[in-house]
Amino acid sequence: GIGAILKVLSTGLPALISWIKRKRQE
């Protein structure tokens, strides 16, 4: 359901953003 999708986004998005920020700093 949508709740599972939101849960995945809420946990995965911060990690993805921090990873992108690290990659862009290099």
From Swiss-Prot:
- UniProt keyword annotations, A-Z: Amidation, Antimicrobial, Cytolysis, Formylation, Hemolysis, Ion transport, Membrane, Porin, Secreted, Target cell membrane, Target membrane, Toxin, Transmembrane, Transport
Q: Which residues carry this modification: N-formylglycine?
A: G1
What Gene Ontology terms describe what this protein does at the molecular function level?
porin activity; protein kinase inhibitor activity; toxin activity
A Pfam short name: Melittin
Do the record's keywords include Transmembrane? Answer: yes
Give the site residues for Important for the flexibility at the center of the helix, flexibility that is important for the stability of the voltage-gated pore. P14
> Chief subcellular site?
secreted
Biological function: Main toxin of bee venom with strong hemolytic activity and antimicrobial activity. It has enhancing effects on bee venom phospholipase A2 activity. This amphipathic toxin binds to negatively charged membrane surface and forms pore by inserting into lipid bilayers inducing the leakage of ions and molecules and the enhancement of permeability that ultimately leads to cell lysis. It acts as a voltage-gated pore with higher selectivity for anions over cations. The ion conductance has been shown to be voltage-dependent.
Q: What is this protein called?
A: Melittin
